[in-house]
Amino acid sequence: MGFLEEVRSYKESQIDTSPEYLRKLEELIEERKEFYDFEKALTSCGTKIIAEVKKASPSEGNIKEVNPEEQAKLYEKAGAIAISVLTDEKYFKGSLEDLRNVRESVKLPLLRKDFTVHKVQILEAKAYGADIVLLIVRMLSDKELKELLDFSEELGLSPLVEVFTLDEAKRALDAGAKIIGINNRDLETFKVDINKTKELAPKIKDLGAKFVISESGISKREEILELMNYQVDGFLIGTSLMKSENPYRKLKELLGF
């Protein structure tokens, strides 16, 4: 069994569709007052970075124990356009509580970073404060991708649709995706190569994507400047910020300040 198959099986086993839980989510959604526009943030001036709060990962193991709210506040102060919060507990040591706590701490669009395989997870994302949800094409059938993408938009959330190949990008765009994330990390081997973005970004823009985000493996300002030449609109950066002794200064450096 490959890594994504293992993850999918685990995620499906964790889905709670009980009437009581769905009512709880509906109540939390009704109570939510603040929403932030990710697409608008992607049209702002300057380098656009989605900064990630990530305590661990399958490729890195434990990275750093941090207070998610404090880390997110540093990112906001430094100039991130959005914050990505890992909510997966098993592989990334995250939680929905981390998402809720970050929501109460910053006034930026929030991405629920998780392996989304069911509509309940999208309800959770909205209930706990996300404005953006991650959909990984490689994990989903065409039917599932379309249903989850449409459901996200019906709830007023922005789907960030992640791809690793041009065929996956075509599937995403056929399903109606506007924001495509190119993962420079192969989720089966965990190998990282930012040339993946150089290879795919111009082609994906030519196919009609509104925005293209480069994800994973970016740690230097020079890499960002280089990738900007390939029609990249934004960058999702986690590990290099989490490993930094001064994440505020590191993010400023990546932004060009």
Curated annotation (Swiss-Prot):
User: Which reaction(s) does its UniProt entry say it catalyses?
Assistant: 1-(2-carboxyphenylamino)-1-deoxy-D-ribulose 5-phosphate + H(+) = (1S,2R)-1-C-(indol-3-yl)glycerol 3-phosphate + CO2 + H2O
Q: Cite the entry's keywords alphabetically.
A: Amino-acid biosynthesis, Aromatic amino acid biosynthesis, Decarboxylase, Lyase, Tryptophan biosynthesis
Q: Which PROSITE patterns match?
A: IGPS (PS00614)
Q: What is its EC number?
A: 4.1.1.48
Q: Which Gene3D superfamilies match?
A: Aldolase class I
Molecular function terms from GO: indole-3-glycerol-phosphate synthase activity; phosphoribosylanthranilate isomerase activity
Pfam families in alphabetical order: IGPS (PF00218)
Task: Identify the metabolic or biological route this protein is part of.
Answer: Amino-acid biosynthesis; L-tryptophan biosynthesis; L-tryptophan from chorismate: step 4/5
Q: SUPFAM superfamilies of this UniProt entry?
A: Ribulose-phoshate binding barrel
Q: Which GO terms describe its biological process?
A: L-tryptophan biosynthetic process
Q: Which family does it belong to?
A: Belongs to the TrpC family.
Task: Output the HAMAP family linked to this UniProt entry.
Answer: IGPS_A (MF_00134_A), IGPS_B (MF_00134_B)
Q: What is the name attached to this protein's record?
A: Indole-3-glycerol phosphate synthase
Q: Which organism is it from?
A: Aquifex aeolicus (strain VF5)
